[in-house]
């Protein structure tokens, strides 16, 4: 009974936190006078990846950076396969070419680079530093571009939020999302354990979704409120943060031993999911892509559990 209450509490907390966090993103874009997608790709993406960053850093300091690697790469599959797949079921997403520029193609290149580093069965500190350096260069590039594109403030539905209120809403909203993720993982794990479900299954299926709950709520609410560019930017930015910063930090603290078969599967699924996200010339990502993404995610989970 307690576990069910935890899950219900997680749902309520996630809804409230997600609404506050989305308003904070829109408020930040308004006050900084930059496009919403830039704020989503940077601030929102980094904030929603906080659970993965915390977990991977703690694991690396404990001498188990493989946990951080699995969480980061697995979360990337969850982000696109599960989360955007669900978002597309609500309807097609209209994007622009600007939404799929350098950030998207870098997100495609990162899994290939990670695979090359992993071929010898480990990601060495030097290779992790390379990933982290690429992340910092990309971040500087995005910030520089944002400063160049600053213009007059435009009403984007953020209301009359002051910068201070936007910041407070962002902190409270993100805190609620992270807490909701922890409640969800705790409740679901308790139920699964009571039913005799294997611990690995719990980790692969439930914990991955729990740590990605901030992205899930942000993207779904962005869709419902008509801010699709926020959802797209958050997921692409989160994938870059996971693949470059989190793996880079974990590997810099401690070299990562790589189970090549599992990592190859995860990287391949993440890459295929990104390719399915690429829109046509009209910029439209059609609804049936969502079905394909969900099938891909389900296949990834099933194969992972059987391996």
Question: Which role fits each region the language model picked out?
Answer:
Residues 1-307:
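Hydrophobic alpha-helical segments, chiefly the membrane-spanning helices
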């Amino acid at each position: 009974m307690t576990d069910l209450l935890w899950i219900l509490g997680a749902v309520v907390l996630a809804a409230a936190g997600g609404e506050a966090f989305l308003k904070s993103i829109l408020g930040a874009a308004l006050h900084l006078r930059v496009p919403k997608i830039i704020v989503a790709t940077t601030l929102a993406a980094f904030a929603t990846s906080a659970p993965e960053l915390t977990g991977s850093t703690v694991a690396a300091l404990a001498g188990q950076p493989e946990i951080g690697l699995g969480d980061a790469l697995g979360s990337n599959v969850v982000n696109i396969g599960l989360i955007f797949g669900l978002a597309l079921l609500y309807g097609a997403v209209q994007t622009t070419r600007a939404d799929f520029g350098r950030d998207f193609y870098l997100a495609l290149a990162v899994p290939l680079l990670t695979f090359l580093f992993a071929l010898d069965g480990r990601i060495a500190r030097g290779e992790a530093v390379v990933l982290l350096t690429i992340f910092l260069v990309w971040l500087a590039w995005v910030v520089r571009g944002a400063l160049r594109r600053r213009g007059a403030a435009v009403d984007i539905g953020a209301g009359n939020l002051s910068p201070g209120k936007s910041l407070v809403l962002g902190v409270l909203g993100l805190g609620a999302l992270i807490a909701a993720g922890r409640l969800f993982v705790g409740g679901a794990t308790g139920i699964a354990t009571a039913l005799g479900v294997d611990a690995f299954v719990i980790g692969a299926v439930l914990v991955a979704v729990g740590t990605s709950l901030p992205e899930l709520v942000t993207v779904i609410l962005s869709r419902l409120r008509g801010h699709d560019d926020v959802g797209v930017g958050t997921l692409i930015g989160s994938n870059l943060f996971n693949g470059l910063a989190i793996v880079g930090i974990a590997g810099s603290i401690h070299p990562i031993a790589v189970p090549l078969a599992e990592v190859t599967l995860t990287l391949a699924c993440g890459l295929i999911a990104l390719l399915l996200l690429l829109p046509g010339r009209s910029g439209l990502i059609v609804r049936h892509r969502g079905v394909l993404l969900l099938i891909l995610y389900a296949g990834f989970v099933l194969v992972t559990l059987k391996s």
